Amino acid sequence: MFSSITLRQLKNSPISTLKHTRNFASTMEGFKELNVTMPKPFVYKVELNRPKKLNALNRAIWFEIGKCFDILATKDDCRSIVLTGAGKIFSAGIDLPDMIALGGKLAEHEDVARKCKILEQTLKDYQDHFTALERCPKPVIAAVHSACIGGALDLILAADIRMCSSDAWFQVKEAEIGMAADMGTLQRLPRAIGNQSLVNELCLTSRKIEPTEAKDCGLVSKVFDTRDSLVAGALEMAEQIASKSPVAVQLTKRTLVHARNNSTQTGLDFIRYWNMAMLQSEDFINAAMAQATKSPPPAFAKL
């Protein structure tokens, strides 16, 4: 495969170590309920920013989440994303006053068909905003401290990697407030932990999941002692991902997401057709040659 590549070509190729920039910081403006920053090169941090309301998920923050991740999906200076929460807890879940306001909107109509149409479109919009994390080709790492309740669990289940601090706890809250979870938990939790009996128990009883159990069952992959070490660890992993070829990383995520809902053969077809193009990328050639010659990892062009 490499016979046509000479050492001179290798020498002239853009192989160099990705430099870590100290005190690197940038902010993406235009959001009220989110704090979006770029603490490291190619790494964005999206922070739920309603600490006085325990980061409860109201209509505004829901829509901002969808908008933010759709924007980051297209930014060539974004290669990985860390999702956190400001304040005492990650998120208390659905903002109940917001739900009550929706009830008032439904009360304006007497006909059940018209009420159903409003509610169906609202739920569809909300689902789409959370699915933006999964739809985004850049890997998303959810870093959870303290409480992650109801709709917040729906949110992090759309992330690619989940980790938490030792004070974290998770709860499928919806059954306790008289509803079934409708933003992704019932669809994504079974795939995340792979134990249908445990999924049924958690969703039907609404009991809390502590960090040790969360790691043991696969809900999270890492548990950190403190919130600070959690965020630092998440950013370190995001930086590691960002140092890889964006061509490779983004196609890997797309293929993993595709594989969840398709057969093995369909998944093999999917990656084969994609790699017909991607294996011709300079990223593959440069990364492979760096490995073969034991050179430092290359710096990759924006994508």
Per-region residue spans from a language model:
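Charged catalytic carboxylate motif
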Residues: 60-64, 125, 132, 233, ...
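Crotonase-fold acyl-CoA enzyme core
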Residues: 131-246
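Short loop-to-helix capping motifs
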Residues: 50-51, 244-245, 281, 294
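Glycine- (often His-adjacent) and acidic-residue-rich active-site loop
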Residues: 77, 85-129, 178
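Terminal peptide-recognition signature
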Residues: 46, 50, 64-65, 83, ...
